[in-house]
Amino acid sequence: MYTFKDQDYFYALLCDGMGSGREAALVSRIACQFFKHLLSCGASLETVLGTVNDFLLHQSCECSTTLDMVRFDLLDGQCDFIKCGACPSLVLRGDNTFKISSTSLPVGATREVHYEKVTVRLRPGDKIILISDGISSQIEGSPWLSALLSGSVRPDPQGMAEDILRTAFTGAEKPDDRSVLVLEVSEC
């Protein structure tokens, strides 16, 4: 996971390498670093996706990673959710919850990389939740989502992330890597 600011944008990245263990963690970390550095250098999203995809395709292992990116325009409040094989994200606005999902494949899975982009105009107080598949498995009806929607998790981003992780680990049969990132919009 990375967050960074570049000129007029704030970025949040969550990459989740396919599989488990050290190799998957390394693929995730390398992909996030590629995205961060290339975007910071001014490369277009398409160029960065193509570069990371080519890099992963040319590794000796079958490497691929999901990409869940939030690109928030600091000038106009528009937020692009860019997804490649990523789990659904949530936007919490007051008592409303919006799910942003994708059917695209992970980066490094095929020769051509495809992504889906959803643009949302955010408001102060909105919260964005990005999660990995270790948390999202069976998102509908999951205990952490029920706890979140019933208001039984702490409202601050750090507390909410900790509560989601704790609830997601409850009753887990086989541990999978689990990542959650909660962002709150303070002003637009």
Regions inferred by a protein language model and the residue ranges of each:
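Acidic loop->beta-strand submotif enriched in PP2C/PPM serine/threonine phosphatases
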Residues: 1-10, 64-67, 99-141, 173
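Short strand-connecting beta-turns/loops that link adjacent beta-strands
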Residues: 6-8, 74-76, 188
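Short glycine-aspartate micro-motif
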Residues: 12-13, 81
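Active-site-proximal, acidic helix/loop segment immediately C-terminal to a metal-coordinating Asp/Glu
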Residues: 19-41, 126-175, 188
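A short, polar/proline- and glycine-enriched secondary-structure boundary/capping micro-motif
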Residues: 22-26, 91-94, 109-114, 140-142
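Catalytic core of PPM/PP2C metal-dependent serine/threonine phosphatase domains
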Residues: 25-94, 168-176, 183
